Amino acid sequence: MYSLPKLGLMLLALTISAPPSGAIASEGLDGVSFSNDPHMLFVPVEEIALALGWEMHFDQESGQLSLNDHLLDAGHLRKLTNGTLLVPLDELQRAGATITWSDDGMQVLVASDHRKIAIRFADKHVEVDLANQRLRAYQGTRLVLDSHISTGREGKKTPPGEFKAGPVKSPMHRSRLYHNAPMPWSVQVHENIFIHGFRKVPQHPSSHGCIRLPLAGANPAKWFYDWIDLGKPVTIKGHWPAAAASTTTVPVHVERSVPPARSLLRKVIIATVVTIAGSMIIWFVSRDYRKI
């Protein structure tokens, strides 16, 4: 799925040394799964390498990544949007690990020599933070996606509440309310409210009520679509910030009205003062002139 040369920037000459022999990882890891390949479980390469005491090395010249001296198949690897590299369990098995599934299929024990670690097939849930305009997706306790979003603007606010993903899920949905507008990587949340991709996603509410994810960069919209399963809980909470209304408060100077009588009196006083001052100036000038 990803070519190894592209992984070079992230794993440039990276080598993880083995921990002391005999160590056993007592804590488990929450794995990552995807809706378009639901039976495959992934785990971050660096985490599993440390847990099993395996070396991980990227050869810059050949563009190949090895784990426990096994060259990984780049076509089987995935990434989180933050660049974290994920390796599937079958690649771990080819690298020399023993894979043992639990009876309920919700956990797998990965072992190598005297080291072992449990990887959980944890549940997924999504949190939409209206106040901070963020979408965070979790698998178990693992944060797998943290992206800025844009929700419903004033008059079209995104409703808070507890929802479930679906039932509509489409790589290209069309809006029935807004002139057949394209909504790529759409996941329905509630009635006409969808999580979907959009070209420009400002970090403030600007949509007609939907939750917009960026298509640019690592494409969080597509990543979320590939990851989320129908029926998984989606929590929308908080209140959109007041600043999201895109209005700026400008100080306004208000002239206080002056009653007509007071205004006339003021003018008379000013005129009188000016006249007196002028007369005094003329008197002083005339007096000095007569002395000369």
Residue locations for each model-derived region?
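Bacterial N-terminal signal peptides
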Residues: G8-P19
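Extracytoplasmic
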Residues: M40, Q60-S62, F121-D123, L130-N132, ...
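A structural motif detector for short, solvent-exposed N-terminal "entry" segments of globular domains
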Residues: S112-E154
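C-terminal membrane-anchoring or membrane-association module
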Residues: G278-I292
